């Protein structure tokens, strides 16, 4: 998982979700697209 100050969807399968006040990008098709907003 990469940590970025600004997160972006990298493909059409990426979803931006919020957990415990942090934003995440999750992608089931390509797990290397996972990101967290730091």
Swiss-Prot record:
Q: Name one GO molecular function term.
A: structural constituent of ribosome
Read off the PROSITE patterns from this record: RIBOSOMAL_L36
Question: InterPro entries from the entry?
Answer: Ribosomal_bL36 (IPR000473), Ribosomal_bL36_sp (IPR035977)
Q: Which GO terms describe its biological process?
A: translation
Entry keyword annotation includes ATP-binding = no
* SUPFAM superfamilies to which the protein is assigned, alphabetical: Ribosomal protein L36
Q: Which UniProt keywords apply?
A: Ribonucleoprotein, Ribosomal protein
What does UniProt give as GO cellular component?
cytoplasm; ribonucleoprotein complex; ribosome
Q: Name one Pfam family in it.
A: Ribosomal_L36
**Of which family is this protein a member?**
Belongs to the bacterial ribosomal protein bL36 family.
Family matches, as PANTHER family: 50S RIBOSOMAL PROTEIN L36, CHLOROPLASTIC, LARGE RIBOSOMAL SUBUNIT PROTEIN BL36C
The protein depicted here goes by the name Large ribosomal subunit protein bL36
Q: Which organism is it from?
A: Chlorobium phaeobacteroides (strain DSM 266 / SMG 266 / 2430)
